[in-house]
Amino acid sequence: MQIKDNIKPILPHLIAVLIFTVVSFAYFYPVLEGKVLKANDSTVSKINSREIQDFREKTGREPLWTNSIFSGMPAYLISTKYPGNLIKYADTFLRMYKMPVSVLFLSMAGFYILLLAFGVSPWLAITGAIAYSLSSFFFQILGAGHNTQAIALAYMAPMIGGIYYTYRHDALKGALFTSFILALEIQANHPQITYYAMICLLIFGIVEFVY
């Protein structure tokens, strides 16, 4: 009886995770057959990072600049490894499924957290999360190979939810959660989406201070 009482509060969330997993694999079922989504930008990215990888393998050092694009640009925008970056391990764990299954699952889970923070019931939040993640824009950018953009969008929703929870509910728990998600957002390495998220949060912060 005690075990049942302990499980009951988290049961809707466990069901949500199961539903999101099933929907993600059902939509991208060819992944289960060993197939890979071939996207133009993913191929171009491998080509652009070739010079960086060759230098890394030859010298054992991490290059900070590449001449392979335009007249040269910082390597961190293309391919840079950070051995001391512990948040990378968390990101790898959260994206344990193969692409693009992992990003679809994360976008559902992230928007689910956002809706929960806004006080939406778990069952309605599941529906909203699926509707959000199955919007055409996600599949357009995945088809084009904009993987980092899709990942940043997936982390954007729970980050906004964390800020809202910090203001309206528990400041300490909300701040800790938001800090963790913000680190994942930065780890996604898509400054454009992070910039848009900051604009949304700035507007929300101004409204909170005024009202």
What are these regions (language model features)?
Residues I3-K8, F70-T80, E185-Y195:
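Short secondary-structure boundary segments
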Residues I7, H13, I19, S49, ...:
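Hydrophobic alpha-helical segments and their boundary regions
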